[in-house]
Amino acid sequence: MRKNAAPKRPVVKDPVYNSEQVTMLVNKILRDGKKSTAERIVYGALEVCREKTGTDPVGTLEKALGNIRPDLEVRSRRVGGATYQVPVEVKPARSNTLALRWLVTFTRQRRENSMIERLANEILDASNGLGASVKRREDTHKMAEANRAFAHYRW
C-alpha cells in the first residue's frame, strides 16, 4: 500500500479553448495513444455544439458536466460479516472525474454514426438535463438516498 497520496499533477490548459476541462475530456476520449484523433473528435464535437446552440461550447460543456457531477455515492463497508452500502460525499476532483468518465462511457454507447456526433449530442443532452450520463447521476443519488440508514457507518 502507498505510504502517502501521490501528488496531483497540474492539468495543462487546452491550446484552442484555454480550458482544463477540455484537456481532461481529450485525455478521457484518448485510445491507443492517438491524441490527435481524440483532439479532432473533441474539437469537432464542440464545434457541432457551437453550431446547434449558438453559444460558447466550453460553457455548454461546463453546464453538461455540472449536470452529471454526483454529490453523493455509495461505498461498500464490511461490518461484522455484513456488507453495507454506505452513502458518502464525493470530493470535487472525484466528482469531476466521474462526470467525464460517465460522459465518455455513455457517448460510446450511443447509436449515431460518428463519434463526433455522439459526443456532441451527449454533451447537448447533458446540458439540458437529459441523456444517459445524467440518468447515471440520478441513479447514484437514488442509491445513496436509499441507503441513508447506513450513513452512520461512514468513515
Curated annotation (Swiss-Prot):
CDD domains recorded: uS7_Bacteria
Keyword RNA-binding attached: yes
One BP annotation, GO: translation
TM region(s), chain numbering: none
Domain of life of the source: Bacteria
Annotated InterPro entries: Ribosomal_uS7, Ribosomal_uS7_bac/org-type, Ribosomal_uS7_dom, Ribosomal_uS7_dom_sf
NCBIfam families named in the record: rpsG_bact
Function: One of the primary rRNA binding proteins, it binds directly to 16S rRNA where it nucleates assembly of the head domain of the 30S subunit. Is located at the subunit interface close to the decoding center, probably blocks exit of the E-site tRNA.
Family: Belongs to the universal ribosomal protein uS7 family.
Protein name: Small ribosomal subunit protein uS7
Source organism (scientific name): Corynebacterium aurimucosum (strain ATCC 700975 / DSM 44827 / CIP 107346 / CN-1)
